[in-house]
Amino acid sequence: MNLDQYLPVLLFILVGVGVGILPMVLGRLLGPVRPDSEKNSPYECGFEAFEDARMKFDVRYYLVAILFILFDLEIAFLFPWAVSLKEIGALGFWSVMVFLGILVVGFVYEWKKGALDWE
């Protein structure tokens, strides 16, 4: 086995790691170091930092996040299906239609239950 073939890959990895680490090292070595309480305090979009990091969130945020992930995964399943639609034939087409039907029924159920209402 000839290891000379892997030299470009090794060089590519070394250059990539160097590009990632070199700016951090240069910033640490060349940057000014004058810490004070103002610089060390957390900054949150122009507002004063909250006292407690454990803020209570409304459950609807989590519900929207879960629904987003669910329908995002649906798109992830539909893309390979659309690419290979010619090869999979009628059985593949109808199996995806059943999959979409189940998702549509779930979406209508969520809509009727008020999961998408923000009031």
UniProtKB/Swiss-Prot annotation:
Q: Which residues form the signal peptide?
A: none
One MF term in the entry's GO annotations: NADH:ubiquinone reductase (non-electrogenic) activity
| Disulfides per UniProt | none
Species of origin reads Polaromonas naphthalenivorans (strain CJ2)
| Enzyme Commission no | 7.1.1.-
> How does it sit in the bilayer?
Multi-pass membrane protein
Q: Which UniProt keywords apply?
A: Cell inner membrane, Cell membrane, Membrane, NAD, Quinone, Translocase, Transmembrane, Transmembrane helix, Transport, Ubiquinone
Q: What does this protein do?
A: NDH-1 shuttles electrons from NADH, via FMN and iron-sulfur (Fe-S) centers, to quinones in the respiratory chain. The immediate electron acceptor for the enzyme in this species is believed to be ubiquinone. Couples the redox reaction to proton translocation (for every two electrons transferred, four hydrogen ions are translocated across the cytoplasmic membrane), and thus conserves the redox energy in a proton gradient.
The protein's name: NADH-quinone oxidoreductase subunit A
| Catalysed conversion reaction | a quinone + NADH + 5 H(+)(in) = a quinol + NAD(+) + 4 H(+)(out)
Q: Does the keyword Transmembrane helix apply?
A: yes
What sections of the protein cross the membrane? 7-27, 63-83, 88-108
Q: How does it assemble?
A: NDH-1 is composed of 14 different subunits. Subunits NuoA, H, J, K, L, M, N constitute the membrane sector of the complex.
Q: Name one GO cellular component term.
A: NADH dehydrogenase complex
Location within or outside the cell: Cell inner membrane
Where does this chain mainly localize?
Answer: membrane
Q: Which domain of life is it from?
A: Bacteria
**Entry's family note:** Belongs to the complex I subunit 3 family.
tRNA processing: present as a keyword of the record?
no
Q: Which gene encodes it?
A: nuoA
